[in-house]
């Protein structure tokens, strides 16, 4: 739920130049980082009290889960930080084309996150390959957008500073 909420908050706040929303997302991200760090410490202490067979059997899953959660939080922070800095410094906003392209992809990413969350919550992994395919398609779409932006930079049709954040 954290990833879905904060990804959406970061993107919509950035597209609408909402500094308060970006700060809220960054604060939430810092809180989540601390929470994961605390859970990792607590889990490590708990692992010391379990017998070796149980630790070997279940410990790996615990640490992998923490690592995956950390990656999600780190990714949201890597998205939010430059958006916050860009908006806070009153740099030029994205132009209408960039907003449209990025907004469309962001909606698709939010939908993918929602679908994955539903599958995890219901413990139903049927057709999970469909979500993996959708994620790969979104990666390709993001690469395509990056190439288009590089072409705009080359043709000097936009602001370099705005292109950097895009």
Identify the meaning behind each predicted range.
Residues 1-166:
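Cytosolic, long alpha-helical scaffolding segments
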């Amino acid at each position: 739920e954290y990833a879905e909420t904060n990804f959406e908050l970061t993107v919509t706040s950035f597209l609408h130049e909402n500094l308060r929303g970006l700060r809220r997302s960054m604060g939430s991200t810092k809180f989540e980082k601390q929470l994961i760090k605390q859970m990792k410490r607590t889990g490590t202490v708990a692992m010391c009290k379990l017998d070796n067979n149980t630790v070997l059997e279940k410990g790996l899953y615990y640490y992998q889960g923490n690592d995956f959660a950390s990656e999600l939080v780190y990714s949201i922070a890597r998205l939010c930080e430059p958006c916050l800095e860009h908006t806070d410094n009153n740099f030029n906003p994205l132009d209408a084309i960039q907003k449209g392209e990025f907004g469309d992809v962001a909606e698709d990413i939010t939908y993918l996150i929602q679908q994955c969350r539903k599958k995890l919550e219901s413990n139903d992994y049927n057709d999970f390959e469909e979500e993996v395919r959708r994620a790969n398609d979104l990666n390709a779409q993001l690469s395509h957008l990056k190439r288009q932006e590089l072409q705009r930079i080359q043709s000097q049709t936009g602001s370099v500073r705005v292109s950097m954040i895009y």
